[in-house]
């Protein structure tokens, strides 16, 4: 018993010494608090802007290195991402900004600051508290004023969705942004017709020609050589005048990272430990002799399961709005294959119409849809006689393409029109 007490006492002493040393390390680190707001010009310069009815909003999401430089601390380490806002209230009334609409899990300034407090540095801790507090975005927007600050949101990679809501007396204005986040390379940022089709005439289609053109496209994606059919091209997105990514990121979709050494290592790690990897790369598929322009996905808690969409910008517009053709399918697991470099591939669910319907519902729930319809073009395949993709996974479909027209402003479900085009299987005449 005496020996046990002696060992216990020694263990307590060692633990106390460890705590003292750790506290000293934290304290020393806390004195190195050196924020540099002078570098904010970089993210302010790339801020996106929207305006309506006397209100002008600018927004920018900070990357990991930008936030560490500006705030003097590694906020990303704790899953925190500042979003810079500037709101000009050019009206005659005081307005109010509601930060919870941008990020329901946003952090308070004291909550952020406390994560970097030192054990023996009350003065430095107080300086941190004041610094983070003074930089938060105020909620009150005086008449004829410009108000700036930060919302301490949850960390996102690739694209950060920002829903900015400003309220006044009998008025409500909303501004939606899909803000690029500096850092890793992603598939889908900065895609423009001028860069994809340099020197080409982009033809604007009316509704009848749009339907015919979309139905005339090939059934499927291709391999890099253009010889073999891959997943079916079962999706078309007609963007609004705004950013086509907004409806997707508003519903929790993430851009996929480009396939490089870093993303391969992270993919292998997530696969071994069955971890979540929200921005994992997708294998390339080809349309117009090029791989996808945009790759989006919604992942579950394991890298093995996700729904993903690939999009290609077409050389056409509708009412001067970009037209994207693509495919949507769902990964339901992983299997061995000799068709890929790492001898494994995701297995897709065979009912690709289910995934098409899921995407339609998701976009409808975003509110950013003005109308939708279906066109021919994929070609039907039954469950008893399915087609296969490039890695041999079978799939069946009614053969139709979903065509979704996006809207700049949110709409209620009752305001969204369905075009009287083709009717997908599973919908009766009453759906017409």
Q: What does each model-identified segment do?
A:
Residues 37-76:
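Low-complexity, acidic Ser/Thr/Pro/Gly-rich terminal tails and inter-domain linkers that flank the onset
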Residues 67-82, 90-94, 140, 225-226:
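Short, solvent-exposed beta-strand/turn "edge" segments of beta-rich domains on protein surfaces
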Residues 81, 88, 259-430:
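A cross-kingdom signal targeting lumenal/periplasmic-facing segments of multi-pass membrane
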Residues 88-93, 156, 240:
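Short solvent-exposed strand-capping/beta-turn motif centered on an Asx-Ser/Thr pair
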Residues 93-101, 163, 245-249:
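Short, hydrophobic/aromatic beta-strand segments
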Residues 217-247:
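Terminal, regulation- and interaction-focused segments at domain boundaries
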